[in-house]
UniProtKB/Swiss-Prot annotation:
Listed EC numbers: 3.4.23.-
Protein name, entry field: Plasmepsin VI
Similarity comment: Belongs to the peptidase A1 family.
Residues in the Extracellular compartment per record: 29-441
Active site, per annotation: D127, D324
Gene3D superfamilies tied to this protein: Acid Proteases (2.40.70.10)
Topology, Cytoplasmic side: 1-7
Cross-referenced PROSITE patterns: ASP_PROTEASE, PEPTIDASE_A1
Subcellular location: Membrane
Primary location recorded for the protein, binned into one broad class: membrane
Function: During the development in the mosquito midgut, plays a role in sporozoite egress from oocysts.
Transmembrane regions: 8-28
Organism: Plasmodium berghei (strain Anka)
Keywords: Aspartyl protease, Hydrolase, Membrane, Protease, Signal-anchor, Transmembrane, Transmembrane helix, Zymogen
Length: 441
C-alpha cells in the first residue's frame, strides 16, 4: 500500500487532475497563421480549425514487422536477447543515460534538461502520453509561465527559429481540460546528463492561462510519445524527442525505462538506452506487449476481472490502454470504470483492506498469449496518514475519466500501474515491456 500524509494525498489528487489536463491526450492542431495571433477573430478561426482537425482522426493501428510473422518464437528470443539488459550488466561501450527524478508527493516525477548554447536549465516531466516538447519562452510575460524558468532564444548561439518571414510563423494552439497555451516552434540542442540531441524541435510557450500552470512544480513537458500520425506538420518538422534520438543514432538501443517508487523519500528514475536490473525483481520475466496505435504507447486490453466477485469488463468489446508516465492513477471510461469502483467496497478508515479483491488486468502479449497482471489492494489503495491524530484514510487509485474521440475512449495506466510494474518502452520494435518492480534497495 502506498502511504501519504493527509495533506500530501489531497495534493496528489488535485495535482493529478491538473496534470492530466496538461497532457496532450487531446488533439493538438498546428496551422500557419499571421503573427497577429492576439486578434480575437484570428483566435476564433484558429479554434474552429482545431475542431475540424479533430474530425479527421482515424484509429491508426500498426502491426508487427512482417519479417517476424512466420517466426514469432525467433522474434521473442531475439527481443529477449536484445533486452538482456535486465539479466546482465550492460557493456561499458553501450551508450545510455540515467536520471533520478524528483518525487513530488508520489504524483509527479521531475527531471532536469538543458537547452541551447550556453545551456539553459529546466525542470520537466517526461511524459509518454504526449509527443510535445514544451518550455516557457521569455516572450511569455503573463499568465502561468511567469513563475517558471523561461528559455531565452536570443541567448542561445544554436537556436534556429521556424519563422519563414517577418509576418508568418507556425504556431500551435493547445486546449486542455482547464487551460490553454500557444506555442511557437524552433530548433535547438538538448542535453540530458551528457547526451546531446542536435536540433530538437521545441515548442516555446508564448502565452498560457494562469490555471493550472502557475501551480505546477515544473517548467515544461518533454513528450516521449510518437508524433501525431494525422498531423503533417508534426510528422515532417516536429519529431518527438525519442524519434530524434533514434534518427540521430544516439543510442545503441532505442528504449527507455521508467521506475515509480512506493515511498515518498525515494526518487523515481528514467533511463534512456537500457533498463536497470536494480528496479526489477530478480528472476521475474519481462512480458512484452505490441503497441497497437501510433497515437500513444497503447496496448490491447482484453479484460479487467474481480475474480472473487464474478465480475469482468471488456470481455465483449475491444478495450485499449495507454501506458502513461504523466498520469497518477489508473483511469478508464466511466461506463466501464464506475461499475468496477463500485464493486470495491473500501472503508475510508482502511479497516477492510485485507478483504478487498485482487484486480486482474488481462492483456495479450507479443506472442498472442494471454497475460494476467494482478493488483492486490496494497497496489491500488492509496493510504493517507494523519500526523496529528495518527489516524488513516484510504482511497482507491482508480478513477473514471472519459477521453473524447478520436483519442478515446481509452484506459490510462498511470503511475499506480507503473509503480507495480517497472516499464520498458521499446521504440525499435514498438513494444511495451513490464516486469514486477523491486522496491527493496
Amino acid at each position: 500500500m502506498t502511504n501519504f500524509c493527509i495533506k500530501s494525498y489531497l495534493f496528489l489528487y488535485l495535482s493529478f487532475l491538473l496534470f492530466f489536463d496538461i497532457i496532450t491526450i487531446f488533439h493538438v492542431s498546428s496551422i500557419r497563421i499571421s503573427t497577429v495571433l492576439k486578434n480575437d477573430k484570428k483566435k476564433k478561426n484558429f479554434n474552429t480549425s482545431l475542431v475540424e482537425e479533430n474530425k479527421k482522426y482515424l484509429f491508426n493501428e500498426i502491426k508487427l514487422n512482417n519479417r517476424f510473422k512466420n517466426d514469432i518464437k525467433g522474434y521473442i528470443q531475439n527481443i529477449n536477447n536484445f533486452h538482456s539488459i535486465i539479466e546482465s550488466k550492460i557493456p561499458n561501450s553501450l551508450l545510455y543515460v540515467h536520471e533520478d527524478l524528483i518525487n513530488f508527493h508520489n504524483s509527479q516525477f521531475i527531471g532536469d534538461i538543458e537547452i541551447g548554447n550556453p545551456p539553459q536549465s529546466f525542470k520537466v516531466v517526461f511524459d509518454t502520453g504526449s509527443s510535445n516538447f514544451a518550455i516557457p519562452s521569455t516572450k511569455c510575460v503573463k499568465g502561468g509561465c511567469t513563475l517558471h524558468n523561461k528559455f531565452d532564444a536570443k541567448k542561445s548561439r544554436t537556436f534556429m527559429s521556424n519563422l519563414k518571414n517577418k509576418k508568418e510563423s507556425i504556431y500551435t494552439y493547445v486546449q486542455y481540460g482547464t487551460g490553454k497555451s500557444i506555442l511557437e516552434h524552433g530548433y535547438d540542442d538538448v542535453y540530458m546528463k551528457g547526451l546531446k540531441i542536435n536540433k530538437q524541435c521545441i515548442g516555446l510557450i508564448i502565452e498560457e492561462s494562469m490555471h493550472p500552470f502557475s501551480d505546477l512544480p515544473f517548467d515544461g513537458i518533454v513528450g516521449l510519445g510518437f508524433s501525431d500520425p494525422d498531423n503533417s506538420f508534426q510528422t515532417k518538422y516536429s519529431k518527438s524527442l525519442i524519434e530524434t534520438i533514434k534518427e540521430q543514432n544516439l543510442l545503441q538501443q532505442n528504449i527507455f525505462s521508467f521506475y515509480v517508487p512506493k515511498e515518498l523519500e525515494k526518487s523515481g528514475a528514467i533511463t534512456f538506452g537500457r533498463a536497470n536490473s536494480k528496479y526489477a525483481i530478480e528472476g521475474e520475466k519481462i512480458e512484452w506487449f505490441p503497441v497497437i496505435s501510433m497515437y500513444f504507447w497503447e496496448i490491447n486490453l482484453l479484460g479487467i476481472l474481480l475474480p472473487d466477485k464474478n465480475f469482468e469488463i471488456c470481455s465483449n468489446k475491444k478495450c485499449r490502454a495507454a501506458v502513461d508516465t504523466g498520469s497518477s492513477l489508473i483511469t478508464g471510461p466511466s461506463s466501464l470504470m464506475q461499475p468496477l469502483i463500485e464493486n470495491i467496497n473500501l472503508e475510508k478508515d482502511c479497516s477492510n483492506i485485507s478483504s478487498l479483491p485482487i484486480i486482474s488486468f488481462v492483456l495479450k502479449n507479443v506472442e498472442g498469449k494471454t497475460v494476467i497482471l494482478d493488483f492486490t489492494p496494497d497496489d491500488y489503495i492509496l493510504q493517507e496518514n494523519s500526523e496529528e491524530d495518527n489516524s488513516s484514510q484510504c482511497v482507491i487509485g482508480l478513477m473514471s475519466l472519459d477521453i473524447p474521440p478520436p483519442r478515446g475512449p481509452i484506459f490510462i495506466f498511470g503511475n499506480v500501474f507503473i509503480r507495480k510494474y517497472y516499464t520498458i518502452f521499446d521504440n525499435d520494435h514498438k513494444l511495451v515491456g513490464v516486469v514486477k518492480s523491486n522496491h527493496n534497495f
